[in-house]
């Protein structure tokens, strides 16, 4: 029997409807959530992501600003822009679209953002709070994954969770989040990475398998336990469709795994819409905290 499809696009829409109401409530107090997205260069994927974020913010009634800089922009100028937005009362969330050009120290840029406006959750202050289960802003993709699990009624308490990938953006934070003794967590978590000798040994015992490997179809059906929940974080461009659009696939070999899993997220339409939605959740929360509401 084929797996249940967990459609992140549907769950994201539910959350966005709630956000619209909360934004209207804040507006009654004279507060409009404000988000600035800083884009360096003209990478097509980054430009597409930034456009999607801006459109979503506008639909929710947020104040949205895009600060586009050329690829040769200096690190010092970028730091000056961030310092300006740190002080701007209209801006509650600052997002720097990654990756940055090689001549810019990514860490230095992210660390310059006011932790109270760090809606990506990458500042060391917010990472530290995440580690002890007290984060104000959860990293957007891991937060989206957790909400997918909670809102799909998937039991994490006591579950064997295997995360494939140890990036600072997805793998490490989702592992830490699911370890916490909290709702939507309290799992036994294993993290696989490039140093793992036999990934399949671990993935085959996972009740919940979260894949963020950055490699197309890295997880095949023989690596998945019967009835497992599979969350595919990967987005890989593997060609072009007949109408000229990018052809995408995840890190999971979807069709064969779908026949074995109990539930699975598609690519696109799975984790992606949740990432943008959780960015909006964080921006609204930052606005509320800033106003003391």
From Swiss-Prot:
Species of origin: Syntrophus aciditrophicus (strain SB)
Pathway: One-carbon metabolism; tetrahydrofolate interconversion
Entry superkingdom: Bacteria
Catalytic activity: (6R)-5,10-methylene-5,6,7,8-tetrahydrofolate + NADP(+) = (6R)-5,10-methenyltetrahydrofolate + NADPH; (6R)-5,10-methenyltetrahydrofolate + H2O = (6R)-10-formyltetrahydrofolate + H(+)
Family: Belongs to the tetrahydrofolate dehydrogenase/cyclohydrolase family.
GO CC, any one term: cytosol
Residues that, per the record, bind NADP(+): 165-167, 194, 235
GO function terms (MF aspect): methenyltetrahydrofolate cyclohydrolase activity; methylenetetrahydrofolate dehydrogenase (NADP+) activity
SUPFAM superfamilies per the UniProt record, alphabetical: Aminoacid dehydrogenase-like, N-terminal domain, NAD(P)-binding Rossmann-fold domains
Subunit composition and interactions: Homodimer.
Record keywords: Amino-acid biosynthesis, Histidine biosynthesis, Hydrolase, Methionine biosynthesis, Multifunctional enzyme, NADP, One-carbon metabolism, Oxidoreductase, Purine biosynthesis
EC number(s) from the headed UniProt entry: 1.5.1.5, 3.5.4.9
Role of this protein: Catalyzes the oxidation of 5,10-methylenetetrahydrofolate to 5,10-methenyltetrahydrofolate and then the hydrolysis of 5,10-methenyltetrahydrofolate to 10-formyltetrahydrofolate.
Protein name (record): Bifunctional protein FolD
InterPro entries: Aminoacid_DH-like_N_sf (IPR046346), NAD(P)-bd_dom_sf (IPR036291), THF_DH/CycHdrlase (IPR000672), THF_DH/CycHdrlase_cat_dom (IPR020630), THF_DH/CycHdrlase_CS (IPR020867), THF_DH/CycHdrlase_NAD-bd_dom (IPR020631)
GO biological process: L-histidine biosynthetic process; methionine biosynthetic process; purine nucleotide biosynthetic process; tetrahydrofolate interconversion
Pfam family for this entry, one: THF_DHG_CYH
């Amino acid at each position: 029997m084929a797996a249940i499809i967990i459609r992140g696009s549907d769950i994201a829409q539910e959350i966005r409807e709630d956000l619209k109401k909360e934004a209207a409530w804040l507006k009654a107090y004279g507060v409009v959530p404000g988000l600035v997205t800083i884009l360096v260069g003209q990478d097509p994927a980054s430009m597409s992501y930034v456009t999607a974020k801006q459109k979503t913010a506008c639909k929710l009634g947020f104040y949205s600003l895009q600060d586009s800089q050329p690829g040769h922009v200096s690190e010092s100028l970028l730091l000056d822009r961030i310092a300006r937005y740190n002080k701007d009362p209209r801006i509650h969330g600052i997002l720097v679209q990654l990756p940055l050009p090689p001549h810019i120290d990514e860490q230095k840029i992210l660390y310059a953002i006011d932790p109270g406006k760090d809606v990506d959750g990458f500042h060391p202050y917010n990472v530290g709070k995440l580690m002890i289960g007290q984060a104000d802003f959860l990293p957007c993709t891991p937060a989206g994954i957790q909400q997918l699990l909670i809102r799909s009624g998937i039991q994490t308490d006591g579950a064997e969770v295997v995360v494939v990938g140890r990036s600072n953006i997805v793998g490490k934070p989702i592992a830490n989040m699911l370890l916490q003794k909290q709702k939507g967590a309290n799992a036994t978590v294993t993290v696989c990475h490039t140093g793992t000798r036999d990934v399949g040994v671990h993935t085959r015992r996972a009740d919940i398998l979260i894949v963020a490997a950055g490699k197309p179809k890295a997880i095949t059906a023989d690596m998945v336990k019967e009835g497992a929940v599979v969350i595919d974080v990967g987005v890989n461009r593997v060609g072009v469709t007949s109408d000229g659009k990018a052809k995408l696939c995840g890190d999971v070999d979807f069709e064969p795994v779908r026949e074995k899993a109990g539930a699975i997220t598609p690519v696109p339409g799975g984790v992606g819409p949740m990432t943008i939605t959780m960015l909006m959740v964080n921006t609204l929360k930052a606005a509320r905290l800033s106003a003391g509401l």
